Amino acid sequence: MVQGTTSDAGKSTLVAGICRLLARQGVNVAPFKPQNMALNSAVTVDGGEIGRAQALQAAACYLVPHTDFNPILLKPSSDTGAQIIVQGKALTTLEASAFFGEKSKDYKAMALNAVLDSFERLGQQYHTIVVEGAGSPAEINLRAGDIANMGFAEAVDCPVIIIADIDKGGVFAHLVGTLALLSESEQARVKGFVINRFRGDISLLQSGIDWLEAYTQKPVLGVLPYLHDLHLDAEDALTDSPTKQAKSCFKVRVLVYPRTSNHTDVDPLRLHPDIDFDYVSLQTQALAQTPEIAADLLILPGSKNVRADLAFLREQGWDKQIAKHLRYGGKVLGICGGYQMLGERIADPLAIEDVFGTSQGLGYLPISTEFKAEKQLRCVAGELTLIGQTVAVKGYEIHCGESQYLTSSDAAKGAPLRLINELTCDEQAEKSFADGCLSEDGQVLGTYLHGLFDSPDACQLILRWAGLEDAQAIDINAIREQQLDRLADVLAEHLDLPQLQAILTASVKP
């Protein structure tokens, strides 16, 4: 099990790298994260929902995502509440006190049972399971009833490696302090450390490593270099330093609201060689010292709290910037929650996201959205038709809202996408359904389809629709595979593989 001294220490990346390293050696390996808190998620082969990082780790194992890889997923919908997803299915929305406070016993008992159930199933199918912890195991206020870190490791008798990020400073204090706050049995479970994101001459670090090993009696299993331009799906936070200027003057800007979700949708554009890409947030606008949003294509991504994020968008004056952008001939694309915002009306009569009520949309698409209790989760494939061309497209849908055209005449104009659900049986899969909406003037496009730009031909067609005539096709899946192999190569060079293998071998039950 890989645990970290802090969030963003490198746990997800190390697990993905170990998974790819083992899978390339022919080991029957799978990833596992007992409990994850993230806004980026993926649809699984069994019709559920897991954290995006576990979907990436599954790809590292050459596996399709399954709900057992991440049995508990917490998706924050406000500063104090989160949707609880258990083995792929949305269960309820709880306040923080319900799963971290004195009232948490019922939740934690249920969650632990689900976690152990999924882990046992994986143990029957795979020779090796590489487990990822969450945050830090030394959070004193979260240790009671813990199922994400040492609580899980103790329950299944799992060895632990602790990773720390040296790039932020204080790596020795982080490692020693984390170890000191663990119980004796938990300390004994820690088999070694990994130091992550090191820059410079490794010989200058050696005296610190020698001291750490002598003081803790634990080995340092490796020092991993800072990997520049490692393009892998981010678990939650936006990718560091996303701004990228290209030779082309074609500008793509993505709005960032407080509950932005599945921002990995735009990774193919962020990496596209012909695109000047950036996010638009409070921070970027403050740095630019201007409210202006200059772009050819403006994207409204998904949201875990659509009505609250729409209110935030208006508070920033971005609604006026969108209107100005369209007056000057720009294009706007809304994905999932962003699609709903572009419609006429958003209703939440059951308080699915936060509080019940109705919000007026931005009014660019003739649709009305209402949130339902049952979440739509499906992997889909089909066709996208724009500017007189039709191409293949593939992706997934995760949404509680159901959008309807306002009138039959709006519906008669046809949707830009025609899809089938890949998770259903052959007979049902033959029944295609429409998705999305294109404004009458052709400037505003909306869809529920996540992963839209992962299909090279669809990405190319949307860029042409937006005004980039000679747009190249970019294959994000091929890039992801290259980056996973690159990561595995780095681990093979910088980790003590014999020690790592000894830890794995000792943990395998007869």
Swiss-Prot record:
Q: Which InterPro entries match?
A: Class_I_gatase-like (IPR029062), CobQ/CobB/MinD/ParA_Nub-bd_dom (IPR002586), CobQ_GATase1 (IPR033949), CobQ_N (IPR047045), CobQ_synth (IPR004459), GATase_3 (IPR011698), P-loop_NTPase (IPR027417)
Residues annotated as domain GATase cobBQ-type: 249-458
User: Which pathway or pathways does this protein act in?
Assistant: Cofactor biosynthesis; adenosylcobalamin biosynthesis
Question: Which residues are named in the active-site annotation?
Answer: C336, H450
Q: Mention any Pfam family matching this sequence.
A: GATase_3
Keywords associated with the record: Cobalamin biosynthesis, Glutamine amidotransferase
GO function terms (MF aspect)? ABC-type vitamin B12 transporter activity; catalytic activity
GO BP annotations listed:
cobalamin biosynthetic process
Q: Which family does it belong to?
A: Belongs to the CobB/CobQ family. CobQ subfamily.
Q: Kindly give the HAMAP family that the UniProt entry links to this protein.
A: CobQ
Role played: Catalyzes amidations at positions B, D, E, and G on adenosylcobyrinic A,C-diamide. NH(2) groups are provided by glutamine, and one molecule of ATP is hydrogenolyzed for each amidation.
What protein name applies here? Cobyric acid synthase
Look up and give the organism this protein is from. Answer: Shewanella oneidensis (strain ATCC 700550 / JCM 31522 / CIP 106686 / LMG 19005 / NCIMB 14063 / MR-1)
